Amino acid sequence: MSERVDVEQHRADVARLLAGLADRPTEEVSVHQGALGRVLASDVVAPGPLPRFRNSQMDGFAVRAADVASAAPGVPVTLPVVGDVAAAPGEPAPLEPGTAVRIMTGAPVPDGADAVVPVEDTDHVTFNGARDEGARDNGVRGGGAHRDSATKVEIVRGRAAGEFVREPGSDVAEGAVVLRAGTVLAPHHVAAAAACGIAQLTVRVPVSVAVVSTGSELVAPDEEPGPGQIWDANGPALAAAVVAAGGQVGLRLAVPDDPEVVRTGLERAAALCDLVLTTGGVSQGAYEVVKDALPEVTFRSVAMQPGGPQGLGRVAGRPVLAFPGNPVSAQVSFVVFLRDLLRQAGGLPPVRQVPAALDAAIVSPAGKRQLLRGRWVDDAVAGARVAVVGGPGSHLVASMAAADVLIDVPAATTRLDEGAEVITWPL
């Protein structure tokens, strides 16, 4: 290693290297497909009011409020029913004074009507001369118990003007902001846009990352390893981490311990993606193939454990980050050095670090910042605390799988007692 730096220095250097990624282009996606999980690049503004027209909030009868003002149980108001209005295309005829129309939820309220009397506030409805003796009890709804046209209705409760009538713009006014820039689109956001008649959404183009695993010993998880071979955990893990941080995987490569093959693969990755991310071949062993293939990249030792060996620079003009090959080291490196930068480039906020109390005392070697795997535990007296999971080894993937957080122990700290406050990085 050519130099040794602390964690914050390396974080700052990585941030400078990747600063250009923050200026993301935009693209249009359809609300029908491809919008889920994308980040809005600009506010979404309603092109018109929602609802677009006056419509009924209930199944019932559209009336003039003045015509039913005196209605009460025992002294109903009887009105002729002059038609039906369904939630269907078309515009209903104006309502004449002293009449009613049967109306369905969402149907346009006729001009002249200023209130809707719910079915529950009617007692007897006559259908083509046949009297129904209890509309409230038998659940008469538009087109439900009776599909014939109603001719007369007895209303037992008056309704004030405006009751159960949805006015245009009462949900969303024309020109109102429906969705804010930076929103991560979920199904309910897509629904809001579609309901406003917005078919296309402007989203940020995610950072495209090439994930390159190095090592002749690696085989894919669906292959049978031979003697001395292991399954590649870093490729799938870091590809998933990239997507979880708002990026996209533009290329997945696994290359053997051959500097020329590695160099060719990385140049191909640089031509296709915004960022190249490698794992393995960056320490001080005899076969550190990434170091051999990239003499223009800075390799250094960062005062942290796990994840000390790191590299950063450019290949073919593209930024490249080189992480260690041990699985825990690679995942910790992603969380500490890259996750928030990818999120920022994608328009997402950083993952908030969380203070926590230790469940038990720990000791830590001086001189290296420790990032221990931890999980949340419940203490009946002290409440939620964080406990160390597994040992310090950078190969212990089971402990990483069981962890909820990384416990951050400063380099100068050699012991922390039970109950001591620590900073955690959520995984």
Residue ranges and their predicted role:
Residues 28-33, 42, 55, 88, ...:
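Flexible glycine/proline-rich
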Residues 1-75, 102, 128-146, 167, ...:
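Short, low-complexity N-terminal leaders and the immediately following helix N-cap/first helix
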Residues 2, 44, 62-256, 385, ...:
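Short, glycine/charged-enriched hinge/interface segments at domain edges or termini
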Residues 2-8, 199-323, 327-333, 344:
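Helix-rich terminal scaffold detector
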Residues 56, 96, 117, 271, ...:
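Structured loop/turn residues at beta-strand edges in well-structured enzyme cores
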Residues 5, 9-12, 27-30, 34, ...:
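Conserved active-site and cofactor/substrate-binding residues in soluble primary-metabolism enzymes
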